[in-house]
A protein has these predicted regions:
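Glycine/proline-rich active-site loop of Rossmann-fold NAD(P)-dependent oxidoreductases
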Residues: 134, 147-148, 158-169, 201-211, ...
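NAD(P)H-binding glycine-rich loop region in Rossmannoid oxidoreductase-like domains
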Residues: 37-90, 105-107
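Mid/C-terminal beta-alpha module of Rossmann-like enzyme folds, strongest
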Residues: 198-256, 279-290
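Active-site Tyr-X1-5-Lys
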Residues: 124-151
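Conserved Rossmann-fold NAD(P)-dependent oxidoreductase catalytic core, especially the SDR/UDP-sugar
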Residues: 83-128, 151
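N-terminal Rossmann NAD(P)H-binding glycine-rich loop of SDR-like oxidoreductase domains
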Residues: 3-23
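Glycine-rich NAD(P)-binding loop of the Rossmann-fold in SDR/ketoreductase-type enzymes
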Residues: 72-83, 123, 127, 131-132, ...
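A conserved pocket-lining segment of Rossmann-fold NAD(P)-dependent short-chain dehydrogenase/reductase
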Residues: 172-190, 194
Length: 290
């Protein structure tokens, strides 16, 4: 049985991974630890085989460029995971999984100009969130060796029942709008159960390295809004002819490019083993909305 400590009690991903691993009785013993304050330093890690570090400050538009928040991002997203990993290694933990982000690449995709992230794409974070995560990666990866395996996960948008963030905006569109722009774009996203299954496989394998999870299918924003509406028992009509207006609006409103641009991981970059996507895109939307 693998003994796992999730550092970051109450985090969406940590909570969902714990629930997912509970479906495999007798294989995993999972605990959570709140990382607020200094009390965690008194916790012994000697009873654990694996630490999954999910604690962190999430990406917030209101703070991502504010200089007043730079120190806080560094303390929580860089210094904390490094301190946890150092303690884990010193106390005999065998594997450390760090939840990073696609934002370490610092890429945006203006509508009509697709961007594909490959193994050769350099890191170029552009805000406090991305920079703090990239800085943590730079300090964690050299700690990896035969007895202490460090795995870095760089998920794109994560969604599932109870999630927050960008998916919530799509839910709002699907719930309120009778029509929605038809745009031919593609984006990488990952359903929480698919992410949890990858984490489970990484734990089973004692894997180390950098992993960029995504669903087996790229997401089209317009189709996803329509599918969410359908799962809610509504119908949203997709109407073409708005691309020029969205391109113009995207020049002034970054959120437009985030919603309708094409930003994807290369398939080969996301491959692992025989696969980890336990749910299709269609299945994941139905499960999220019901």
């Amino acid at each position: 049985m693998k003994r796992i400590l999730i550092t970051g009690a109450g985090s969406y991903i940590g909570t969902q991974v714990k629930a997912y691993l509970a479906r495999f009785p007798g294989q995993y013993a999972v605990s959570e630890r709140n990382m607020h304050g200094e009390g965690w330093t008194e916790t012994s890690f000697r009873d654990y085989d694996v630490i999954l570090h999910t604690a962190g400050i999430v990406h917030r538009e209101s703070t991502k460029q504010d200089p007043a928040f730079e120190t806080l991002y560094t303390q929580v997203n860089t210094d904390l995971p490094v301190c946890v990993a150092e303690k884990a290694k010193a106390e005999g933990v065998k594997q450390f999984l760090f939840l990073s982000t696609q934002s370490v690449y610092g890429l945006t995709a203006p509508l009509g100009k697709p961007v594909m992230i490959t193994k050769d794409t350099p890191l170029n974070p552009v805000d406090h969130y991305g920079r703090s995560k990239a800085a943590a990666e730079a300090k964690l990866l050299p700690m990896s060796d035969a007895s202490f395996r460090v795995a870095i996960l760089r998920p794109p948008i994560v969604y599932g029942k109870g999630c927050k963030g960008n998916y919530r905006a799509l839910q709002s569109f699907a719930s309120q709008l009778p029509v929605f722009p038809l745009v031919q774009n593609q984006r990488s996203m990952v359903y929480i159960e698919n992410l949890a299954e990858l984490i489970r496989q990484l734990i089973d394998d004692g894997a180390a390295g950098i992993f960029c999870p995504q669903n087996d299918e790229y997401t089209n924003t317009s189709r996803m809004v329509a599918d969410i509406a359908r799962a809610k028992g509504r119908r949203v009509m997709l109407v073409g002819g708005f691309t020029w207006a969205l391109k113009l609006l995207g020049s002034f409103v970054p959120a437009v490019n985030k919603a309708f641009g094409s930003l994807c991981y290369d398939r080969q970059l996301s491959a692992y083993g025989s696969g980890y996507c336990v749910k299709t895109l269609a299945e994941s939307i139905v499960e999220t909305e019901t």
